[in-house]
Structures are given as C-alpha cells and as structure tokens.
C-alpha cells in the first residue's frame, strides 16, 4: 500500500525527479538534466556543473585512508566533467564530519587539495557541518565549447562503441580490499580502487575531435552506462565478449575471490574510464590520437546484446551498480 | 596529544582549509573563498556558486514535514546567493536517502521544485545515494555583474550597519517547535522557521544600488555574521540594543521558553535576513528603496561592542551558532 523508493530503483527514482522538473521548467533551462552534468549558458561556452556526494560507510573501500577519501571525492566529480568533454575550472567541497582527529582531517584536506591541483581545479568554496559519519559532497565546475560538449544522446546505428582503458580493475581492487585478503602483487588494482583518476584529457580529446556521437563515464558499471547512452539516443547496443579489455589482473583477483571476472567488468562501477560512440571512420581517426578499445556497435534498438566467445548472442540486463535496488 | 577538530571550532576549521587552499592556488583563482559563495569568471559577469548540506537530524525542526525540508534545502543555498547580490540561475540537488515511502519522497521533491520555481532557479542536475538518514546537499548557481557583487570585505569606519528585517523570529519559531509546546498564535514564527525565504530581491537592490560596502546573510546568528564582515574588512562594529528590530513575537515566545529574547536575536541562526554596511548618505538612499533597520556603525577596530539600553557599552563575544564548537 505504501510503496517505498526501493521499489523503483535508482534510475527510475531519478527519472521521476527529472520528469517532475521537466513538467515545470522549460527544456532550454534544464539542458543537462539526466546527463552527467548540468549546463549553464556562459556566452560562447557552457559552464558544466556536477555534484556528487560520498559517504564514509558506503563509498570508500578503506575509510582509514583519509587522503585517498579526499582524492576520490574530487575524482568522482571530475569524472562527470570528463564525460562531458569539459575542462575543470574549480571545485567546491561541503563536508559534514564527526569529531575527527585533526591529523585525520588534515590528511582528508590534503587529498582534496592534491586532487584539485592534479585536475587544475582550484578549491573555491565550501561549507562544514557536524554529522555522525564523514559525508563529503563535491561540486565540480568546468567549461566546454558549446558545439563540442559530449552528451549521452546522439549515438546512431552503425556507430562503433569504445572504452578508453581496461575494465574491471577498480572493481577487482575494491573487492580485494573489502575481502580483507593480502593485496600483495595487486598494487595497480588497489591504486585504481583507492585513487582513481578521472579521464579529463581523454574527454577533451574526444570533445575537441568533433567525431564523437555520445559519451559517458563508467562509474556505475559498463552495462548500466551503455543503457544510459542507449536510452538517451533511442538505439540499441551490441558488444562482443572477446573485445572487452579486461584488466590484466582481473581474472586472477576474480579467481581468488571466487567471482566472475566478466561480472566485475560489466556490472561493477569504479572504473572511471569513458565509454563513447563514433562512426567507424571517426573511430579510426581517434585511435591514432589516444588509447581506445572498440567493444561493439550501436544497433537500431532492442536493448543490449552480447556476443559471447562462442558467437552466441544473448541479452544483457541493464542493472549495473544500482543503489536503492529493488527486491 | 591528538587534537580533535572540535578543539578548533567551525570558523577556525574553515580558516585552516582556506589557508591551505590559498597556499596552493593563486588569489585570482580563489576569489570568493571565505565569502558566502564562490566566484567564477564568465565574461562581463561572475557566475556565483555555493553549496550547503543539510541533515535530517540536525537542520530541520520538524523532519515529519518533507515538503518544508525540500524548500529549506533550496532556501539556505539561495540565501548565499542573496548575500552576494546575485540573481539565481539554477539549482543542483544531491541526496542520500534511507528507504523512504514514495509519498514522503515525492513531497520532499515537491518542496525542492516549489522553491526552485519561487527563486526562478530551475533544477538542472543531481545525484542520488543511499544513507541511514536524509542528507540533502544543494548547489545554487547565480550571476552577478562584476562591479556589483556584494562581498564580506569593504566595510569602512563610519559606515552604518543595517539589517533587512526583524531578528530572532526564525530562532523563536525553531525553539518553540523543538520544545514540543503548542504553537497556536505563533504561525508567523513557525512559518519563518520551517519555510524561510531567502532575500534575493533585497540582495539585488543592494547590489544594483552600488551603495553597499559589505554584506552577508544571517544564517549563523547576527553577532557571528558581524564578526565575518569585521574580519574580512579589518574593522570593528558597534551596535545598539535599542535599535535591534526584534520580531514582534520574539519576547513572548522567549518568555514561554524561559529564554533571553536578545540571545535569540544575536546568537541564533535561521533569520535569513541580510546584514550590510553602507556610508550614511548611501544608507539614507537605500532606506527609500527597501525595508531596512540601522542597528549600528562600523568602527576602526576592537571587536564588536554593544551599547545597551542604559547606554553602557560592552563587548560581544563572537560565537553565534558554531557547529563543532569547542568545550
């Protein structure tokens, strides 16, 4: 009788907010709504704005590493800017904190400032509050030329689908840390989990090339993000299992943990690579400019298909890493 | 040995972050740092950006009224824009939520969208997460002409100090609600507590007049905000008890609660009026354009003095509503 928000799941919850907002505001006012970041008209450019909130108990594999927590808070926001092909311009940090040791607090801030330096996005404002756990809310501000900005919509049947780097590494690292097992020999996966790097340069290359038809970042899992591009573009997608660039260490870590490596690559967030579409000739040009891995193609419709190593085609269910997931 | 952040208090904690950021970034890059909102260069204008985070258990006198919670989340952010004399342009909402009833969630969003409409700031983006309590993080975006923007710095000795409306009403309403007593007859104070209104129009009048030397909003209590203007301007302040425009109902509510009405007006947040300084001739002009109450004057230095009803001068301690307060 009294439905709860978990009965909808995160994506439908967001759609619910978006449709309410669209019913009230003009479509030119809410251009970026539903995309990775919001767009504000600033003359010849767009100001690109995004806000993401991270909680000590839910978003950090190791909450004993405050510097990494600060770094990651900036990175998840910068990754949304990267997904729009936008150049970072500044960062705002709102925190709510328990009564931390000053040394811990300073390390947290060092991580934030270190990341702000890395992304050339000065810390320009903020707010502090008290809370029972560490809550870190970031707002990233960037700029993009109006006709260059990357959106989720625009993929066309026949376009190729590509990712900017290996898949499943952040997921494998995160699961390894959470398992409490020895992480020796897997420093790269651990680093990718604790100190992910947003693909700002790659986003700028993609945007400035003018060759890309749609793009997003893989923070919620590849299949979920393909679903986003598909829904925004009104197309389908077909990907090939043997073209997925699984990270080198992913099979071994998955085996240690008794997990399916493909599941880590397809349905887990934390990769922070970009996934994008471009016509075949454009993709060819782009491959001379940057690392990219073509994993499939855009289809007319009918959801996401995967062709496995034996050539058998099956449908992928779009779930990804859904917070507030049903059931 | 291991100091905690509570040993510093909120203001010193913020100063600590600011001085770290200033040591790394150029001063032109971090113009608004320490002010009510951040400033981003956008040609002839500034983009004005602010982010505030509210928690179910700490910032809402009645967490059973989701629509009011949504409204207030937008308002506290808009109030920072008002303090800069900026026109709202958009709002971004990041939420982390427990598994709410859908009806409660919809009311929360109705409150957000209602407030966005009121302030003419479309909801342009957002993010959702799971959490154990309701966490609402807003980012407000506004615009201001470069030479018009209101800052905390700029007050000069001899300027007058004024506020845009009655003091202590939101505080009295909040304390009355929290006491669990009958609120009958005090609808105005209750409304001011649950559905405060940011002084956007007043901020725009002040900014466009070009007459104002410094300004901020009174979310953390009058004395605390006077301290902010003073510190940023390198001056002192003198205020007169008999000029403070205590809200009509404040003495009666204070008496019911056994509280000092003056304390509610001086040291409690929730008023959402603006406090500002201007030279005497400018203040005269402004008083023809809007409601304002002159409460004192800017002095050369020496902290905040209050002259009481008997003409006795004493020092006010700058504490206001400090989160993370020492001791």
Curated annotation (Swiss-Prot), chains A, B:
<feature type="binding site">
    <location>
        <position position="219"/>
    </location>
    <ligand>
        <name>ATP</name>
    </ligand>
</feature>
<dbReference type="InterPro" id="IPR016188">
    <property type="entry name" value="PurM-like_N"/>
</dbReference>
<keyword id="KW-0547">Nucleotide-binding</keyword>
<feature type="binding site">
    <location>
        <position position="80"/>
    </location>
    <ligand>
        <name>Mg(2+) 4</name>
    </ligand>
</feature>
<dbReference type="InterPro" id="IPR036921">
    <property type="entry name" value="PurM-like_N_sf"/>
</dbReference>
<comment type="function">
    <text>Catalyzes the ATP-dependent phosphorylation of thiamine-monophosphate (TMP) to form thiamine-pyrophosphate (TPP), the active form of vitamin B1.</text>
</comment>
<feature type="binding site">
    <location>
        <position position="80"/>
    </location>
    <ligand>
        <name>Mg(2+) 3</name>
    </ligand>
</feature>
<feature type="binding site">
    <location>
        <position position="59"/>
    </location>
    <ligand>
        <name>substrate</name>
    </ligand>
</feature>
<feature type="binding site">
    <location>
        <position position="220"/>
    </location>
    <ligand>
        <name>Mg(2+) 5</name>
    </ligand>
</feature>
<dbReference type="InterPro" id="IPR010918">
    <property type="entry name" value="PurM-like_C_dom"/>
</dbReference>
<feature type="binding site">
    <location>
        <position position="52"/>
    </location>
    <ligand>
        <name>Mg(2+) 2</name>
    </ligand>
</feature>
<comment type="similarity">
    <text>Belongs to the thiamine-monophosphate kinase family.</text>
</comment>
<dbReference type="Pfam" id="PF02769">
    <property type="entry name" value="AIRS_C"/>
</dbReference>
<keyword id="KW-0418">Kinase</keyword>
<feature type="binding site">
    <location>
        <position position="36"/>
    </location>
    <ligand>
        <name>Mg(2+) 4</name>
    </ligand>
</feature>
<dbReference type="GO" id="GO:0009229">
    <property type="term" value="P:thiamine diphosphate biosynthetic process"/>
</dbReference>
<dbReference type="Pfam" id="PF00586">
    <property type="entry name" value="AIRS"/>
</dbReference>
<feature type="binding site">
    <location>
        <position position="217"/>
    </location>
    <ligand>
        <name>Mg(2+) 3</name>
    </ligand>
</feature>
<feature type="binding site">
    <location>
        <position position="52"/>
    </location>
    <ligand>
        <name>Mg(2+) 1</name>
    </ligand>
</feature>
<comment type="pathway">
    <text>Cofactor biosynthesis; thiamine diphosphate biosynthesis; thiamine diphosphate from thiamine phosphate: step 1/1.</text>
</comment>
<dbReference type="GO" id="GO:0009030">
    <property type="term" value="F:thiamine-phosphate kinase activity"/>
</dbReference>
<feature type="binding site">
    <location>
        <position position="80"/>
    </location>
    <ligand>
        <name>Mg(2+) 2</name>
    </ligand>
</feature>
<feature type="binding site">
    <location>
        <position position="51"/>
    </location>
    <ligand>
        <name>Mg(2+) 1</name>
    </ligand>
</feature>
<feature type="binding site">
    <location>
        <position position="50"/>
    </location>
    <ligand>
        <name>Mg(2+) 4</name>
    </ligand>
</feature>
<dbReference type="InterPro" id="IPR006283">
    <property type="entry name" value="ThiL-like"/>
</dbReference>
<keyword id="KW-0808">Transferase</keyword>
<feature type="binding site">
    <location>
        <position position="36"/>
    </location>
    <ligand>
        <name>Mg(2+) 3</name>
    </ligand>
</feature>
<feature type="binding site">
    <location>
        <position position="321"/>
    </location>
    <ligand>
        <name>substrate</name>
    </ligand>
</feature>
<feature type="binding site">
    <location>
        <begin position="126"/>
        <end position="127"/>
    </location>
    <ligand>
        <name>ATP</name>
    </ligand>
</feature>
<protein>
    <recommendedName>
        <fullName>Thiamine-monophosphate kinase</fullName>
        <ecNumber>2.7.4.16</ecNumber>
    </recommendedName>
</protein>
<keyword id="KW-0479">Metal-binding</keyword>
<keyword id="KW-0067">ATP-binding</keyword>
<feature type="binding site">
    <location>
        <position position="152"/>
    </location>
    <ligand>
        <name>ATP</name>
    </ligand>
</feature>
<dbReference type="GO" id="GO:0000287">
    <property type="term" value="F:magnesium ion binding"/>
</dbReference>
<keyword id="KW-0460">Magnesium</keyword>
<dbReference type="GO" id="GO:0009228">
    <property type="term" value="P:thiamine biosynthetic process"/>
</dbReference>
<feature type="binding site">
    <location>
        <position position="270"/>
    </location>
    <ligand>
        <name>substrate</name>
    </ligand>
</feature>
<keyword id="KW-0784">Thiamine biosynthesis</keyword>
<feature type="binding site">
    <location>
        <position position="127"/>
    </location>
    <ligand>
        <name>Mg(2+) 1</name>
    </ligand>
</feature>
<dbReference type="InterPro" id="IPR036676">
    <property type="entry name" value="PurM-like_C_sf"/>
</dbReference>
<dbReference type="GO" id="GO:0005524">
    <property type="term" value="F:ATP binding"/>
</dbReference>
